[in-house]
């Protein structure tokens, strides 16, 4: 019969950058692993991470997540981690080459969209390759969103 499905504790969004899709035109997304310490994983599982002001950069053939905030794990005492340290991202060589090429040549930006745990319980970062929107682009997006809402209301009233 109908079984009630429990939410999988592993497959859970921990932090989301909701302003990224408003401020950037997202052209491509890619999933990257994160190199974390034990206390960082425990802190992530508590769900208090923040990636609003963070970005990724290519340095020396490696990609780093910069300015992300993972609060200290309270039970860790002196073995705690630095909350705003740079974290290395795990990608294939081909993926790294593609991202570094798009950042260097085309002037794109690497923007983190969300941090989540996958089915195996590993922390992953959804990374977007995007171009910054100008003010008029943001206004145009907002107009389109308002019009689609209004259109939905009109269709709902008639139908």
Swiss-Prot record:
Report residue spans for region: Disordered: 137-159
PROSITE patterns, sorted: SSRP
What are the record keywords, sorted? Cytoplasm, RNA-binding
Q: Does the keyword Transcription apply?
A: no
Q: Which GO terms describe its molecular function?
A: RNA binding
Q: List where in the cell it is found.
A: Cytoplasm
State the GO CC annotations: cytosol
The record's listing under Pfam families reads:
SmpB
Q: Name one GO biological process term.
A: trans-translation
Q: Does the keyword Protein transport apply?
A: no
| Name the record gives this protein | SsrA-binding protein
What organism does the UniProt record list as the source?
Answer: Mesorhizobium japonicum (strain LMG 29417 / CECT 9101 / MAFF 303099) (Mesorhizobium loti (strain MAFF 303099))
**Name of the gene encoding the protein in the UniProt record:** smpB
């Amino acid at each position: 019969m109908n079984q009630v499905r429990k939410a999988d504790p592993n497959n859970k969004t921990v932090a989301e950058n909701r302003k990224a899709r408003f401020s950037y035109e997202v052209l491509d997304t890619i999933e990257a692993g994160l190199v974390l310490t034990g206390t960082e994983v425990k802190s992530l599982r508590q769900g208090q991470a923040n990636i609003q002001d963070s970005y990724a950069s290519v340095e020396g053939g490696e990609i780093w997540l910069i300015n992300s905030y993972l609060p200290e794990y309270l039970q860790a005492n002196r073995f705690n981690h630095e909350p705003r340290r740079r974290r290395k991202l795990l990608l294939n060589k081909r993926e790294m080459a593609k991202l570094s090429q798009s950042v260097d040549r085309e002037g794109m930006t690497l923007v983190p969209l969300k941090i989540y745990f996958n089915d195996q319980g590993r922390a992953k970062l959804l990374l977007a390759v995007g171009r910054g929107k100008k003010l008029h682009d943001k206004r145009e997006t907002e107009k389109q969103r308002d019009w689609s809402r209004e259109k939905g209301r009109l269709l709902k009233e008639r139908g």
